[in-house]
Regions:
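Periplasmic peptidoglycan-binding/anchoring modules of Gram-negative envelope and division proteins
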Residues: 81-115, 138-143, 183-188
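Exposed aromatic-hydrophobic patches
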Residues: 22-27, 61-62
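Short, acidic Ser/Thr/Gly-rich low-complexity loop/linker segments typical of extracellular
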Residues: 6-22
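Conserved "repeat-terminator" motif of extracellular CCP/Sushi domains
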Residues: 59-73
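A short, solvent-exposed beta-strand micro-motif common in secreted/extracellular proteins
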Residues: 21, 29-41
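Short, ordered, surface-exposed loop/turn motifs in non-cytosolic proteins
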Residues: 1-10, 91
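Structured interaction patches on ligand/partner-binding surfaces of diverse proteins
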Residues: 40-61
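Periplasmic OmpA-like peptidoglycan-binding domain that tethers envelope proteins to the cell wall
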Residues: 114-188
Length: 188
């Protein structure tokens, strides 16, 4: 089921998606909403939407449901890092904010955030860099209110590339895709 709730009211509207996953809700003008999606065996998901300042009340919101399975690795889209850096980029913050919502909607879940580097550089340096990246992601989630007891960070260096190119022949895009963060469910 999927539900919508206006931010300023306690009224909850629930709907079931059709066979294609489509859903519809009547929306009030100039109102903030929180949509919540639940499916057995999957992470609960939510999104915030608003009709404020919109000439049309038709709002399209897609949800990507992840299976809630212990030890399952989920790649976070667009959590990439600049070369030799571990700071959270603005594009990565947007994706980590989605993970914050997911963790808020699933308060019993604990995860490991794992970070990876590309193949350039020495193994020990890359391991240290990936550990800093994973810790940066965890620190970001903690700064948004997720308790540190639910989070673990782990760096894998260049040991688990997502791209199978030979290092010297990898394109810049392939190197970028290897510099990533994923999460694994530790408990549900």
């Amino acid at each position: 089921p999927i539900s919508s709730q206006p931010k300023s009211r306690n009224r909850l509207t629930t709907s079931t998606t059709d066979a294609t996953g489509t859903y519809h809700f009547p929306l009030l003008k100039d109102t903030d909403y929180r949509l919540k999606v639940e499916k057995e065996g999957f992470f609960k998901q939510s999104a915030r939407i608003s009709t404020k300042g919109r000439p049309s009340a038709i709002i399209v919101t897609d949800f990507r449901l992840f299976p809630l399975v212990v030890d399952q690795v989920v790649r976070l889209e667009n959590i990439f890092y600049d070369y030799n850096k571990w700071d959270i980029r603005p594009d990565a913050a947007i994706e980590l904010d989605k993970l914050v919502l997911t963790l808020e909607d699933n308060p019993t879940v604990s995860i490991e955030l794992s970070s990876h580097t590309d193949c350039r550089g020495k193994d020990a340096y890359n391991m240290n860099l990936s550990e800093k990246r994973a810790k940066s992601a965890v620190d970001y989630l903690i700064s948004k209110g997720i308790t540190k007891e639910r989070l673990k960070s782990k760096g894998y260096g260049e040991s688990k590339p997502s791209e199978t190119c030979v290092c010297e022949k990898c394109s810049d895009d392939e190197h970028q895709r290897n510099r990533r963060t994923e999460f694994k469910v530790l408990s549900k």
